[in-house]
Amino acid sequence: KNKQDYEDNYSTGQGSVGTFAARSAGAWGNSLQVVTCPSASAFEQTTTVSQQLDGAAAVGDTTITVDSDATSYLNIGDVIEFSSTASGVDFTTGEKYRVTNLTSTVVTIVQHPRGEGGLITAAVDNARIKRKWRYADQVDGAPGTSSYATTRSGSGDEIHVVVIDEDGSVSGVPGTVLESYSKLSKASDAKSPQGDVNYYPTVISNKSNYVFWMDHNTSGTNWGNAAAGTTFTAVDVPTSESLSGGLDGTASTDGELKAGYELFNDADTVDVGLIIAGPSGSASHIDNLITIAENRKDCVVFASPQRSDVVNISNSNTQTANVVDFFNGIRSTSYAVFDSGYKYCYDRYSDVY
């Protein structure tokens, strides 16, 4: 609902609704994804000799086979490299690939950041894999232990949080990074070097334009403790939560609009000069607004006819008759301006009409 509702009902994790939620109601939030990197191992790792390629892979291949269950050490979205020699740690080609799918011992890849294409250079049998969190370039290195926790004999408190427009409904481009928060802390009393609160639920709550924190990762059993003497539970894989369940509300009734606009009734406490009727546009709604303006005597209502009266009506005489008929149903007043046209315009920022 709002920040106060969040503080009262969710801010300590009592809501049991997952780890993050969209900041406001509506289907728009279904486009969001929140990803976290809670440890150095989640940020970057080199696989062991038991997790190497099981067989060579040719130029152009988009799938590789590995020795053991890849889901235990790779994650969809990881950016990976292959060693140049068998069992080596010579990751010298500079070629990077992103994991798009994992099925046991088969890993599907695309070139990164290109987003398509397979291997540029053949990979040798038993090549080792170095993986890195997909959003490593959005933050300041691997999370570790903050200076605040170090001075209090704590460790492993840092965490990165990134908010993604997964489906593109917010920014227009799927996968856009909307916000990134580097080296926040799991310690409830944490402060940044500048003295600001650095506890990650509080930072997200206070600064994010898109999401609220709702709860800790269930594996982070002591996250939220004070820093002193706490070795924060290591979660060695990145996490991601694609938000869902958001629904747009139904159209407001005239009664609901009346209750909302009546907040403007008191001229002594609310300053308003222009009252816009908005897209509802019913005669009853406009009449309610005129009542407010006439009682205040210091503002004017602006109202338009019904969209169906003028839009897609090809005959101008019919349009005129429709507009006159609509406004004939509304009482005369000196506190309202009635217009008659709808403007078809281009939004160059969103590339829509």
Language model: regions and residue ranges:
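A glycine- and small-residue-enriched flexible loop/hinge signal that marks low-structured segments
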Residues: 1-48, 75-100, 110-353
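A generic structural motif
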Residues: 62-66, 104-116
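Disulfide-bonded cysteine-rich modules in secreted/extracellular proteins
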Residues: 47-57
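Generic beta-strand structural signal
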Residues: 57-59, 101-104
